[in-house]
Swiss-Prot record:
Gene3D superfamilies: 3.30.1440.10
Gene Ontology terms: cellular component: mitochondrion; ribonucleoprotein complex; ribosome
UniProt-listed PANTHER family: 60S RIBOSOMAL PROTEIN L11-RELATED (PTHR11994)
UniProt KW Ribonucleoprotein keyword: yes
Localization: Mitochondrion
Organism: Brassica napus
Domain of life: Eukaryota
Gene Ontology process terms (BP): translation
Protein name: Large ribosomal subunit protein uL5m
Keywords recorded for this protein, A-Z: Mitochondrion, Ribonucleoprotein, Ribosomal protein
One annotated GO molecular function: structural constituent of ribosome
Length: 185
């Protein structure tokens, strides 16, 4: 069974977020990008390279700037190099998923959101939630590289949509608020 069949048929009452094109091809409506930020101790630096979900997908990191210093990060975020010390914790950097990587991550999120107790907040044009590392059990591309994540508490995820208001966002993404047994948050 395709992973989204459960979400589409049993959980989200055919939520308008998902548009079934063929029995195995889905389109996520209104999503522009997914931003993922590891959540860990303030001074913790991941030394093993890229965020694991990006390893098989070749996604790019967004380089960020800090306040009035105007200094940008030029090294690989998550590599804990000395030239990054003193700016902002490496965990403050976000990873942005688009295209195929975003689609795969969306499939995993849609499949497990109804099973796990992640609080979800729908804002103007975004959906925000935090996931604990137990999410890795549902994402093989993460589980294969779990050593990177063994010291973090989870991920902060923001799904940016093309909506202009919260009223436009809510109907499409309401399935994220619905739990396995029909309960909503």
């Amino acid at each position: 069974m395709f992973p989204l069949n459960f979400h589409y048929e049993d959980v989200s009452r055919q939520d308008p977020l998902l548009n079934r094109i063929t029995p195995t091809l889905w389109k996520f409506l209104g999503s522009c990008e997914i931003r993922v930020v590891p959540n860990g101790p303030y001074n913790f630096i991941i030394k093993n390279g890229k965020l694991a979900m990006e390893i098989p997908r070749g996604q790019k990191f967004i380089q960020t700037q800090r306040g009035s210093t105007g200094k940008s990060f030029r090294s690989n975020p998550f590599l804990g190099s000395n030239k990054d010390k003193g700016y902002v914790s490496d965990l403050a950097r976000q990873s942005t998923l688009r295209g195929h990587g975003m689609s795969n991550f969306s499939v995993r999120i849609s499949t497990v959101m109804s099973l796990l107790d992640f609080p979800v907040e729908i804002r103007k044009n975004s959906i925000q939630f935090s996931m604990e590392t137990e999410f890795c059990e549902f994402a093989p591309q993460l589980q294969d590289h779990f050593e990177i994540f063994e010291h973090i508490r989870g991920f902060n995820v923001t799904i940016v949509t093309s909506a202009n208001t919260q009223d436009e966002t809510l109907p499409l993404w309401s399935g994220f608020l619905q739990k396995d047994e029909g309960e909503t948050q």
